Amino acid sequence: MDSLTTALGSVPQVVQWALAGVGALYISAKVLSYLHLVLNLFILGGTNLSKYGKKGSWAVVTGASDGLGKEFASQLAAKGFNIVLVSRTESKLKELAKELEAKNGSLKTKVLAMDYEQDNDDDYEKLGQLLSGLDVAILINNVGRSHSIPVPFLQTPREELQNIVTINCLGTLKTTQVVAPIMAQRKRGLILTMGSFGGWMPTPFLATYSGSKAFLQHWSTSLAEELRSSGVDVHLVLSYLIVSAMSKVRRPSAMVPTPRAFVRSALGKIGCATQNVAYTYTPWWSHAIMQWWVENTIGIGSKIGLQVNLKMHKDIRTRALKKAEREAKKA
C-alpha cells in the first residue's frame, strides 16, 4: 500500500486530476446510459399509432398465421386498423380473418397466401394489386425462418441456408418495396421489422440466421433515414427468446414473454430508444436490460461473448439430436 501511495505521489498532480476527470466522465456516461434505458422502458410511452393513420386505415402483416404475426394482426385489429394478412397457408389466413372480423365489428380483412420461400415475383405483383387503392398505414415485416436446430455452418443443408436468406432478407425487402411507396405518397406510415438478438450479437451454430438478421439491422436503419423526410417511421424491433414455434420455447417467464405480452410492449414503445443504434428498440424490459448489460460489460462482439454463445448453442444442438434419436427409437 505504501509503495502504491509513493508511486501515485510521483505522478504530477495535473495528471492525477486528468485521470480522475476521465474516470468520472466514464462513470457518469454509464449511469446516464442506464437512466436513459430505465426512462424509456418504464416511464416514457411510445408514438401513438394514430400518427400513422385513422381507424379504418390498413395494416399489412407478414407471417400472419401464427405466433407474433397473428398477435400483431389481432392487436392492430383491436385498435381499429383493417388488416391485410400475408402468409403461406391460405386456410389459416381465412380462419384468422373470420376470427378477427367476428371480434371487431366493422373490421375489414384481406388475405394473400404467399410462400416467401419460392421468391415468386408474381406473388409480389399480387400483393401490389391487393393493396391498390388502400390507405396503408402500417407494415409489420414479421415473416422469418431460422435453422431447425443449431448447426455448424459447414453442415448447414444448402436448401436451409437458401431459404433463410430468401425469406428473411429478400422477402422483407421486396415486400417493403411494394408497401413503402404507398406510405411515402400519403406522407405518413410505420414500418416495423422484426430483428433478433441473433443478429445483434454474432451467433455461432446459427451463422446464416445471425447474418440474415444482422443484414436487416443495417438495411432497416439505412431505410429509416432515407424515408424520414417522407413522414414514414421505420424501426427494427429487437428481441431475445419469445414463446413460439420458432424458438421452441413453450413456457413463458420474465425472460421469455408470450407473443401477446411482447406485441403489446412493441406497439406501446414505438420509437423509445432503448439502445444505441438509431431507429432500433428493444421493447421487452428484461431483454433490454440484458442487452444493456452485455454491451457495457463483455461487449457484443467479444471473444468471451462468442465462446459463451458457442457453448450454449452446442448444448442446445446436443439435446435436440438426443431427443430426435429417442423419438426415432419409439417410432
Swiss-Prot record:
Q: Which GO terms describe its biological process?
A: fatty acid elongation; sphingolipid biosynthetic process; very long-chain fatty acid biosynthetic process
Q: What is its EC number?
A: 1.1.1.330
GO CC annotation terms, alphabetical: endoplasmic reticulum membrane
Tell me the residue numbers annotated for binding NADP(+): 60, 115, 123, 142, 209, 213, 242, 244
Q: In which pathway does it act?
A: Lipid metabolism; fatty acid biosynthesis
Q: Which reaction does it catalyse?
A: a very-long-chain (3R)-3-hydroxyacyl-CoA + NADP(+) = a very-long-chain 3-oxoacyl-CoA + NADPH + H(+)
Role, per record: Component of the microsomal membrane bound fatty acid elongation system, which produces the 26-carbon very long-chain fatty acids (VLCFA) from palmitate. Catalyzes the reduction of the 3-ketoacyl-CoA intermediate that is formed in each cycle of fatty acid elongation. VLCFAs serve as precursors for ceramide and sphingolipids.
Q: Which UniProt keywords apply?
A: Endoplasmic reticulum, Fatty acid biosynthesis, Fatty acid metabolism, Lipid biosynthesis, Lipid metabolism, Membrane, NADP, Oxidoreductase, Transmembrane, Transmembrane helix
> What Pfam families does the annotation carry?
adh_short (PF00106)
The taxonomic lineage of its organism, from the top, reads: Eukaryota, Fungi, Dikarya, Ascomycota, Pezizomycotina
Name the PROSITE patterns for this protein.
Answer: ADH_SHORT
**InterPro entries the record matches:** 3_ketoreductase_fungal, NAD(P)-bd_dom_sf, Sc_DH/Rdtase_CS, SDR_fam
Gene Ontology terms, MF aspect: ketoreductase activity; very-long-chain 3-oxoacyl-CoA reductase activity
Query: Could you confirm whether the keyword Membrane appears in this record?
Result: yes
Q: Catalytic center at which residues?
A: 209, 213
Q: What is this protein called?
A: Very-long-chain 3-oxoacyl-CoA reductase
Per the similarity annotation, which family is this? Belongs to the short-chain dehydrogenases/reductases (SDR) family.
State the annotated membrane topology for this chain. Answer: Single-pass membrane protein
Location within or outside the cell: Endoplasmic reticulum membrane
What residue intervals traverse the membrane?
15-35
Q: Which PANTHER family match?
A: HYDROXYSTEROID DEHYDROGENASE-LIKE PROTEIN 1, VERY-LONG-CHAIN 3-OXOOACYL-COA REDUCTASE
